[in-house]
């Protein structure tokens, strides 16, 4: 009984250290700055890797003032008139 308890405790310690090496801060992620001795965090900022997403792509593709508006007059509300001779939003 005591042998199995000791064996279980040893296995738990082994697993704890093995998992500890893979989870959390990896070596080299947090280093000491040479100039001032402060700790520096070298981990990648995952927030900066995200790309902004839009649900309404058609809103980004609208024509702005002074650009070609086509035959249908698809101008934004800031300059709603499509000139017939130039086909530009004014």
Swiss-Prot record:
One of its GO terms (cellular component) is extracellular region. The modification 4-hydroxyproline is found at residues 76, 80. Residues 1-27 form the signal peptide. The modification 4-carboxyglutamate is found at residue 67. Expressed by the venom duct. The keyword Signal applies. Coiled coil: none annotated. It is found in: Secreted. The cysteine framework is IX (C-C-C-C-C-C-C-C-C). Belongs to the conotoxin P superfamily. This is Conotoxin ba9a. It comes from Conus bayani. The lineage of its organism: Eukaryota, Metazoa, Spiralia, Lophotrochozoa, Mollusca.
């Amino acid at each position: 009984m005591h042998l199995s308890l000791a064996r279980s405790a040893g296995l738990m310690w082994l697993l704890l250290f093995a998992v500890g090496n893979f989870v959390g801060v990896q070596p080299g992620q947090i280093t000491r700055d040479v100039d001032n001795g402060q700790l520096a965090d070298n981990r990648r900022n995952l927030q900066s890797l995200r790309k902004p997403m839009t649900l309404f792509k058609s809103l980004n593709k609208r024509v702005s003032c002074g650009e070609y508006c086509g035959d249908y007059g698809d101008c934004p509300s800031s300059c709603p008139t499509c000139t017939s001779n130039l086909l530009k939003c004014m």
